Regions:
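Glycine/proline-rich low-complexity spacer/linker segments in large multi-domain proteins
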Residues: 126, 136-190, 243-246
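Sec-dependent N-terminal signal peptides
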Residues: 4-14
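Beta-strand-rich interaction surfaces with strong enrichment in secreted/lumenal proteins
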Residues: 60-63, 77, 106-108, 119-124, ...
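A surface-exposed beta-strand-loop module
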Residues: 20-23, 94-155
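Short beta-strand elements of extracellular/lumenal beta-sandwich folds
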Residues: 69-82
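N-terminal, polar/Ser/Thr-rich
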Residues: 19-72, 156-160
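Solvent-exposed beta-hairpin/edge-strand motifs
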Residues: 84-107, 194, 198-199
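Hydrophobic helix-coil surface modules that form long, contiguous segments used
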Residues: 73, 165-168, 179-312
Length: 312
């Protein structure tokens, strides 16, 4: 709980400026509407079969077409059965998305009512690992706080496109098939993002590579090696001003602090505000313990909203 408080506090303090300087049209919904939406999703996520298997790793590959607002995905789910004679699994995945194929250890599938039911290619017992691959495409529908959103910087259509996710608490299923419950954290995740070469694609963990493709797109790969729940898997894609610095902890360890800000926001006063993050990390570390993801990075990216969403 202490580490969780630390992470929220740093992000909220670091991103407050956006409420005043960028966003005049922050998305809002009636509390009753959001409560009803989340209640329905929570009930759907309490089905008994979610305990039949344990997810260890997600490999998420997305090709995002900004002009058509269509994403093309390929997700591999690496899992271990928790029961013997496992012959099928269910994943959470929005019905509005189209499943093109299920591969590897998957055979047949049905996709309805936001559930992707997959018949495996055999019967698996406790301790036997398997991989299910899902190829899909579609336009993700927003839900809850946001889930997956195509928009623009500052919510202004005359400014550069802005793509981002805010999947708390059950919104990950709107844009990638997964076991969308906070009780099952994957040990690690790999996220590959292909989109317009002019834009930066930001996600969890450490940058592995950036590759310019022959069709004027760029593929950016991130890897996050801490246990993570699905709603914390995130992305932010737009034209960013980027800078970084190394932060040194009292115990001698160090990690990069990485910042992605809209160019129109990157004035000297705003940059100075974000650069206060290093001091905040020191203060919170003294009170609550060392930053919990010190082996990777602390990253902060501006998006359409005026507040902040803690990821990891």
């Amino acid at each position: 709980m202490k580490k969780f408080t630390l992470l929220i506090s740093i992000l909220l303090l670091g991103s407050t400026f956006a409420q005043v300087y960028e966003n005049t049209n922050v998305p809002c919904k009636p509390i009753s509407e959001m409560a009803s939406h989340y209640s329905a999703l929570a009930k759907a996520s309490q089905r008994a079969d979610i305990f039949d298997y344990d997810v260890h790793y997600y490999n998420i590959e997305l090709d995002i077409n900004i002009d058509t607002e269509i994403i093309y995905g390929n997700v591999e789910v690496h899992l271990l059965p928790e029961v013997d004679n496992l012959e099928s699994i269910q994943l959470d995945f929005a019905s509005g998305m189209t499943v093109d194929a299920v591969t590897v250890n998957g055979a047949n599938f049905n996709h309805f009512y936001d559930l992707l039911s997959i018949t495996l290619d055999g019967s698996y017992n406790v301790g036997e690992s398997l991989v299910v691959g899902i190829q899909y495409h579609g336009h993700p529908l927003q839900g809850g706080f946001q889930a997956f959103a195509f928009g623009h910087q500052g919510n202004n259509p005359s400014r550069p496109p802005m793509i981002s996710t805010l999947s708390e608490p059950y919104g990950a299923r709107s844009w990638w098939p997964c076991k969308d419950v906070p009780t099952d954290k994957a040990d690690s995740v790999r996220i590959s993002l292909t989109t317009d070469a002019a834009f930066d694609a930001v996600s969890n963990g450490m940058l592995v590579s950036e590759t310019l493709n022959s069709d004027d797109t760029k593929t950016t790969i991130w890897e996050h090696k801490y246990p993570i729940t699905t709603y914390l898997v995130s992305l932010a894609i737009t034209d960013y001003t980027y800078w970084t610095e190394m932060h040194h902890f009292a115990d001698g360890d160090s990690m990069p602090l990485e910042y992605w800000m809209y160019p129109s926001s990157a004035t000297a006063p705003m940059v100075e505000r974000w650069n206060r993050t290093a001091g905040m990390i020191d203060i919170f570390s003294d009170y609550f313990g060392k930053y919990p993801f010190a082996e990777e990075k602390y990253g902060m990216a501006q998006f359409q909203w005026g507040g902040a969403m803690e990821h990891q």
